[in-house]
A protein has these predicted regions:
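Short hydrophobic/aromatic beta-strand micro-patches
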Residues: 81-83
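Conserved short beta-strand edge segments in small beta-sheet-based binding/regulatory domains
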Residues: 101-111
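Short S/T/G/P-rich N-terminal loop/turn motif that feeds into the first structured element of a domain
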Residues: 8, 13-60, 65-76, 85-88, ...
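Short conserved AdoMet
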Residues: 85, 98-99
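Short amphipathic alpha-helices in soluble, non-transmembrane regions
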Residues: 92-98
Length: 126
């Protein structure tokens, strides 16, 4: 099954879902680190500071929601946290900046509550 698809009753077995038409939409949180290309740093910073309201509103494709973005300005890198279930849309966002920077790390992350739940389940199964 690909990212961005719904999980249907027939995909995971009748015993897990009672209702025939239930769909589960899974939203994943990703942490992306970016690094501005040294030779593009001034160009990238100029573009970023001059983005219009329309450009900012349209920066992320449909299906990708920014949670936050933090910048290490002197070193030309930073972190972006997004929520999505659409791998294609996430890749499209990354590619939109590929002329000026790279995203060397893109990985799924979870919040505290989810981490505790998963750790508890892991420890309970040992």
């Amino acid at each position: 099954m690909e990212y961005g698809t719904s999980i249907h009753r027939e995909d995971i077995g009748a015993s897990l879902l009672e209702a025939k038409d239930i769909e589960l939409e899974i939203e994943m949180i990703f942490m992306l680190t970016y690094q501005i290309d040294r030779d593009k740093q001034v160009e990238c910073q100029t573009f970023f500071t001059q983005m219009t309201d329309e450009q900012i509103a349209g920066e992320y494709p449909e299906g990708v929601k920014q949670i936050g973005r933090w910048h290490d300005m002197p070193n030309g890198n930073g972190v972006v946290i997004v929520e999505t279930n659409d791998q294609e849309a996430l890749t499209s966002f990354i590619m939109s900046w590929s002329g000026m920077c790279t995203f060397p790390i893109v990985k799924p992350v979870v919040d505290d509550a989810t981490a505790r739940k998963l750790m508890k389940a892991m420890l309970d199964s040992q």
